[in-house]
Amino acid sequence: MSDYPDGLTVRPLTTWPGDLTSPADRRVSPFAATLGTTLSALDRELAAIQARNPVMEVAIEPCQFRIDGRPRARAAATHPGVVLSLPMTSVGPLRYATDRFLSWQDNLAPSCWAWRRCGRSRGTALPAAVSSTPVFERCHLVATPGR
């Protein structure tokens, strides 16, 4: 069983911000991490940016959540998109959404490493608005010198 970060609210995603990536354009994730490893990284990154009241939205039906608010082990998402909303951080409110990869678990991983590459190591935070460019590609644009 995977340990979700303390204080993280996980809830069903009711509305995707923008257009979903077409299934034909989704790809296999270049990140080789288990959900447990990704959740540990998420916990570290949330602590590093002093995130309070983080919310993760996943396209899982409400009936597939356990009593404690976590998705059941065999919960199936209707699409792989994941939205992370961080209303209170040391760099201001942040919101990330991506559906580039085949599973929501794989889409969660880039957000964890993108925070380090963007806001934490470069001192630049992305705005709370969501764009169609995946978070790790947006961070590359922000963090690339000369841009």
Regions found by a protein language model. Give the residues of each.
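Short "pre-J" leader segments immediately N-terminal to J/J-like domains in DnaJ-family
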Residues: M1-G146
